[in-house]
Design a protein with these regions (language model features):
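General helical structural elements
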Residues: 14-16, 271
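Carbohydrate-interacting regions of secretory-pathway proteins
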Residues: 33-274
């Protein structure tokens, strides 16, 4: 179901991203972290300074394998095909904020972008399930009940081992997904760039967070933690578990569903506190 709501201008979105990158590019990581209210760069493009893996085993594994390659954070199971995954978390914690991050993933991995996360991997997750019957952009309760606001699924068409097209199906009714707003599958497909870098932007604000996501300037989902209804969602319990602030994190899903040798890639991680 598509609800009318003004969309972020693609041109303005791209100009804002360029301006933010230019502002933070010359700042050392430590100095950038001290500037509140402005865009800061959480990833220097060369090292994993300012980041850490889950310190203890969680449901997805001991941490997965994370390294920097060609200016991007790369994640994969450790070793490939072992089922051993995990998360990479920012050392700095955020409560109310906006974040932009570029991603370029292989087709097949189930990943995620974590908000207000703790070292146990509990969080509000922006799904990055880039596989058949997957979803990218809606909200899921990782370790906080398993509530799910996905409004539709995505499926891939693969030719000669390469993803060539994406389709959408299994559209949910508003009472099933519970979103304040969702784009249509057609809008999502139009926004996504196959085999290219895609920019995810997320705004997270409030005691019971109001979370909005965009892909390449297209508004994808608006989730209201104060009013969301789902059998597995208890807003007070989630708030007690996560607190007011948490890390930003990226995920390598554990288990056998992750294709052997598949990788996820992230870069240009810009955050500003609100």
């Amino acid at each position: 179901m598509h609800y009318k709501s003004h969309l972020v201008s693609r041109r303005r979105f791209l100009m804002d991203t360029v301006a933010a990158t230019a502002t933070t590019a010359s700042l050392p990581l430590g100095q950038a972290l001290a500037v509140k209210g402005e865009w800061i760069n959480l990833f220097d493009g060369k090292t994993l300074e300012g980041w850490h893996r889950n310190p203890q085993r969680i449901g997805h594994g001991t941490g997965g394998k994370w390294y920097v390659e060609d200016g991007a954070i790369v994640g994969e199971q450790d070793p490939p095909g072992s089922g051993n995954g995990g998360i990479l978390l920012s050392d700095r914690k955020f409560g109310d904020f906006e974040v932009k991050i570029d991603m370029n993933h292989d087709w097949g991995p189930c990943s995620g972008f974590f908000l207000r996360a703790n070292d146990k991997g509990q969080c509000f997750q922006v799904m990055v399930d880039f596989h058949d019957a997957g979803n990218v952009g809606h909200i899921y309760g990782e370790g906080t009940g398993g509530f799910n606001s996905r409004a539709f699924d995505i499926n891939g068409q693969v030719k000669d081992g390469k993803l060539v097209a994406i389709t959408g199906d299994n559209i949910r009714k508003p009472e099933e997904h519970g979103c304040v707003y969702t784009c249509t599958p057609e809008e999502w497909i139009k926004a996504w760039r196959i085999a290219k870098w895609n920019t995810l932007m997320v705004r997270c604000i409030g005691k019971y967070p109001h979370i909005t996501s965009w892909l390449n300037g297209q508004k994808i989902c608006e989730f209201d933690g104060a009013t969301f209804k789902h059998p597995n969602y208890d807003r007070e319990k989630v708030r007690s578990t996560l607190g007011e602030k948490g890390s930003i994190a990226v995920q390598v899903h554990g288990g056998g569903g992750w294709p052997k040798g598949a990788k996820v890639r992230w870069r240009n991680i810009l955050v500003r506190e609100l």
